[in-house]
A protein has these predicted regions:
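HhH-family (HhH-GPD) DNA N-glycosylase catalytic core used in base-excision repair
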Residues: 1-172
Length: 172
């Protein structure tokens, strides 16, 4: 699919990929673009410190990630692992609870997370080099659009998610 009607506006892959490349060029110049590797090691350290499997720590982190800044996300996930509680919505707390008692297989955690963004975020945290998984969050949406996404635009159908993810895959 080369184009999509997104929230009433035509969006082409050409424009989306162009916007991704503009941001990527700026990031490459300013840093080494290793965010997921840094995050992978942070999750691994959290897991070791709290004597749990990395997959459980990554799954819990992913479960409580929606609408959360990264520093708060890590803190909430660790709080959840240590105390069984964190400040997030009931739905995401329940997902984190289910992850933490799941045994830690990727397939089971994937099914528990059951949402494009948090499933892909989990896989990116676990396997930073695997290009099959793309976390399309509000920041990624804004980059493709070339502007800050509205609250309405931050909610994606499965078809829209794949369109945005494909834009990133084709640039990578």
């Amino acid at each position: 699919m080369r184009k999509i009607i997104f929230k009433g506006n035509l969006l082409t892959k050409y424009k989306g990929k162009k916007n991704i490349r503009l941001v990527l060029e700026k990031r490459i110049k300013s840093e080494e673009n290793l965010w997921y590797w840094d995050s992978h090691y942070a999750i691994d350290e959290m897991a070791r410190t709290n004597r749990t499997k990395m997959s459980l720590a990554a799954g819990c982190t992913s479960a409580v990630s929606p609408l959360t800044k990264w520093d708060d996300n890590i803190e909430m996930a660790e709080q959840k692992i240590v105390t069984g509680h964190c400040k997030h919505t009931d739905a995401f707390n329940k997902k984190a609870d289910a992850v933490l008692v799941s045994g830690g297989s990727d397939d089971v955690i994937w099914d528990i997370l059951n949402g494009n963004k948090i499933q892909n975020f989990y896989m990116n945290l676990m396997y930073p080099n695997d290009k099959r998984y793309v976390t399309v969050d509000r920041h990624a949406i804004s980059i493709v659009l070339g502007r800050t996404a509205t609250k309405k635009e931050n909610s994606l159908t499965d078809k829209q998610y794949e369109f945005f993810a494909d834009c990133y895959r084709e640039v990578a």
